[in-house]
Amino acid sequence: MIKILQFGEGNFLRAFAEHYIQTSNENGIYDGKVAICQPRKNTKVINALKEQDCKYNILLKGRLNGEIINEVKSVNCVEECIDTVGEYEELKRIFCLDSLEIVISNTTEAGICFIDTDKMSESPNVSFPAKVTALLYERFKQGKKGLVFLPVELIENNGDELKKCIIKYAKLWNLENKYIDYINNECSFCNTLVDRIVTGKAKYQDDECAVACEPYSSWIIEADERAKNIIP
């Protein structure tokens, strides 16, 4: 069951977020699958993942707590990979699933931005926050529960900044005040800070999507009570 939608198919998130989710599933503290979409037009990684049924491996190499680590984590927590441009209707369907709880993003430091020429009628919109505003509005219209947003973009107060952009778009597009209330009261935008060295694509058997990283990782999340009850 898809509970997490991830904007970002790059090496970092696949070696970082999916490692947490995969481990949480294996340890029985979470039971959820991920759908991954790319925030931009380049579909190279998405297509490669589709060729492998969305499965790949993480190679963990380095020292952790004084021990030398050299192990492989097989990732099977990704259920679907979506082309944001070519499969926008499928992305919209995933965004409106009853089971969806969390949206993770890594759209680079420049990804959380407001572009006042973005229009509601564009599908998909240019900026990442505009895409989210339009998709979240569809979810709101269907009467679905709010979501927890976990942006990992390396900017200060990334959750707050994403929320500000979404509200700006809602006002620019003259969307109803009830939608803004939904954003403010039923969704959680968490500020996060992440730490893991991901060295990039790795060679492992015939896996074209394998990634390598250090074993150490840290994910600091400033969560409200609602988010705490959802984040594993």
Report residues per predicted region.
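Substrate/ligand-engaging "lid" and interaction regions
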Residues: 1-232
